[in-house]
Amino acid sequence: MIFVLDVGNTNAVLGVFEEGELRQHWRMETDRHKTEDEYGMLVKQLLEHEGLSFEDVKGIIVSSVVPPIMFALERMCEKYFKIKPLVVGPGIKTGLNIKYENPREVGADRIVNAVAGIHLYGSPLIIVDFGTATTYCYINEEKHYMGGVITPGIMISAEALYSRAAKLPRIEITKPSSVVGKNTVSAMQSGILYGYVGQVEGIVKRMKEEAKQEPKVIATGGLAKLISEESNVIDVVDPFLTLKGLYMLYERNANLQHEKGE
């Protein structure tokens, strides 16, 4: 069984794969202040709830866009699983040809999504990930990672309205009953939702025009389903794209080590 861990700025998503299938997954808040023991006890409870233990896990891979948390997570893996985790970063074999000016600038989550997207959906491809930041990644027909777009995430936009405008409340991100809001909350919900739908459609349109291609558009992340229901440019919603990519990277690197006799 392989344990995969994707750490984002707001949430961390964990999963266990068994024989290539995602057996279970969990989501928890990213906490930069937790120790390896606190993470260890939390993961222990999650595993035990599914009738699993640390000993059932034979390999671990971690992707993180939050560097301060990595020390605690690596220590947790070594202390409780007795396994040194594979970390997505320099040295890992992705098979991805990255055409960024500085490939090291590409976030681990974007690399993982690209690996999974190419394997599952082919190319050319646009991957939209609705996280703390919303990222758009373009993979061309030759399966090269060409770059992308980064915008403030949906929740950041909503929080900015709440924190910077004294009379505007904090809202739930959901579809309002109409585009024209009849009260402050519904007006804000409409602005956030349909403003983002417009952003997605506009950016995807421009990316396609610049690439002179008609790539398939894959959406992932917490609010991908909500946005896709209001947009006509998203072809597939895959909520577990990143976890699948992590598993694929683990298998690729484990097989390479096996071939080398390591």
Swiss-Prot record:
> What residues bind K(+), as annotated?
D129
Which residues act catalytically here? D109 (proton acceptor)
What Pfam families does UniProt report for this protein, alphabetically? Pan_kinase
Cleaved signal peptide residues: none
Q: Where would you say this protein principally sits, based on its record?
A: cytoplasm
Residues annotated as coiled-coil are none
Record Gene3D superfamilies = 3.30.420.40
Give the pathway annotation. Answer: Cofactor biosynthesis; coenzyme A biosynthesis; CoA from (R)-pantothenate: step 1/5
Instruction: Supply the name of the protein.
Output: Type III pantothenate kinase
What molecular functions are annotated in GO for this chain? ATP binding; metal ion binding; pantothenate kinase activity
UniProt subunit comment: Homodimer.
Q: Which reaction does it catalyse?
A: (R)-pantothenate + ATP = (R)-4'-phosphopantothenate + ADP + H(+)
Q: Which InterPro entries match?
A: ATPase_NBD (IPR043129), Type_III_PanK (IPR004619)
Q: How is the cofactor bound?
A: A monovalent cation. Ammonium or potassium.
Annotated SUPFAM superfamilies: Actin-like ATPase domain
Indicate whether Transferase appears among the record's keywords: yes
